Amino acid sequence: PEPSIVPGPGDEDIGGIEDPTVERLEDGYAVYYTGVLGDHAHGQMFYAEGPSLDRLTKTGVALASSKSEGNTKEATVQRTSDGEWRLFYEYAADDASRVGLATGRSVAGPWTEQPTPFMPREDSWDNWHLSTGPLLMDDPHRPVMFYNGATRDARWRIGWVAFDADCSRVIDRGLMPLVTPPP
């Protein structure tokens, strides 16, 4: 079978497609993905939807990169109890990866950027890079995100951060990583 999302024909994703996130909807699927420009150095988050995963249609940019938040990618989406959606994403700033947050009334947006939900911690295993991961929703009053964190020399680890029920405020964060690479 042919892939349902392919690079091109426009310049905005001709350099490649990566980092898919699939959201099952009542009437089909939504897929967020990173589209890489032809220069292979810049990208942004795109959105596709369709009745099945083999019949997706590209709908355009989900969250554009900006001067302050470059290379938006790696979506984690969650609907909150009030029906609003949260879009966590990775972006580039100051030569590092960060986790951003945007809110929207629909899984397709439009999205309103919010303050950065959590930052690197000085003198810690996650003091430089941060990248989104999946949300564990076993306790809907305390969603937990597993995230990637690293030092400036890119020694990556996996940690966790807990949010309030609406994913709008951090209420706890692990001091030590949950997963570390072998020595």
Task: Identify the function of each model-found stretch.
Residues 1-15, 23-127, 137-183:
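Beta-rich carbohydrate-recognition and catalytic domains
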